[in-house]
């Protein structure tokens, strides 16, 4: 963080961006794993604002085949509500820590944050680019589209909530190992700074994070949002997430990455998404997530 701020925790129990029930329980699982006391032990001012109100899941509709964008009205509703909550936190000079929920919630959080910065940078720590558009998405799952929407392309109603779009050149993708054809082309066309798992293997996570920080500084960003999807981590270690891709970042690599980001004091807001306790092992992924967040906010062994 650029300076020590109080933290507002905002839960978003939304599962509407994808097809697996359980990710809506992510905020509860993360809290149950000890997030609040973990942060308070660091002598941080922590305010848990609870969860935003999300529509109940209509199981029959949720499990059915839907034409076009899945659960679109529900996602608009979640986006609007989250946008207001996050914006209020920033106006009160607080650090918004948003707990998902699936990654479609980033449409609401980042669109709110970008209104308060002139040149926001985004670190997308994820196995996927989330850069699809409806025309190129066979699934219609909006959790595969948030970053593209935030750059100004996508469904009209969601774009209207995003008045200050993210510049593609202000984005850094870390952990990529599953990209659709259209996403690969978009990354190439816009020269988005990208670190695939192959790059991380070659460079090491230390150099990747240091390069990320320096790159965003060179872009003269005035804030940095970290969007951390737990599927960036390898599912053999971090199983409780819905879109698993083998060969991901290790738990230790991720700890080190977040330690370096803490030391940089550059990140001004954060999402933590895609924790699904229904497909986890004894809440292991939520516990890992709490430990990672602790490291990000300055927790050390000694």
From Swiss-Prot:
Which coenzymes or cofactors are required? Answer: Mn(2+)
On the tree of life, the source organism's domain of life is Bacteria
The pathway where this protein functions is: Nitrogen metabolism; urea cycle; L-ornithine and urea from L-arginine: step 1/1
The main enzyme category here is hydrolase
Give residues annotated as binding Mn(2+) 2: 126, 128, 229, 231
Could you tell me which PANTHER family the record lists for this protein?
Answer: ARGINASE (PTHR43782:SF3)
- List the protein's name: Arginase
The protein's organism comes out as Staphylococcus aureus (strain MRSA252)
